[in-house]
């Protein structure tokens, strides 16, 4: 698996090894795998976890898992809590659109604040990924 990912990154010239990268960490299998694989390949990664406060105890369990995972793997973790329902109501958008907007705005602000080279997001084939052309790198 590591060799396959490394070959893909190299073939598509996605990530210089000397960069600083933010990995969006939901706590799900895809984002955990991306984070740990990039770290294992020697990339400097920091994780960013958004708690949208939408699923009660389950949201807190995801956050706790991300904290534990990053601590055990010596990875810096950036955490933020959003009142997603309030944002959705205020901006008259769906919960899904509110969460997406909050997440990507946060990732971009964090990228700027810590001078990261790219934001890496794990998606699978059924996900839709929209790239941002203003210098934000999204790795898939």
Residue ranges and their predicted role:
Residues 1-140:
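Core alpha/beta nucleotide-donor-binding catalytic domains of modification enzymes
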């Amino acid at each position: 698996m590591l060799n396959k990912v490394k070959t893909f990154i190299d073939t598509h010239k996605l990530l210089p090894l000397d960069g600083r990268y933010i990995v969006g960490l939901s706590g799900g299998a895809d984002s955990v795998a991306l984070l740990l694989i990039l770290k294992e390949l020697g990339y400097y990664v920091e994780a960013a976890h958004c708690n949208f406060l939408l699923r009660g105890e389950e949201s807190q369990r995801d956050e706790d898992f991300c904290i534990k995972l990053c601590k055990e793997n010596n990875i810096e973790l950036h955490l933020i809590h959003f009142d997603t329902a309030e944002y959705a109501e205020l901006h008259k958008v769906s919960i899904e659109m509110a969460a997406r907007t909050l997440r990507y705005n946060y990732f971009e602000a964090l990228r700027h604040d810590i001078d990261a080279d790219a934001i890496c997001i794990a998606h699978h084939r059924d996900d839709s990924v929209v790239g941002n052309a203003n210098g934000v790198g999204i790795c898939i």
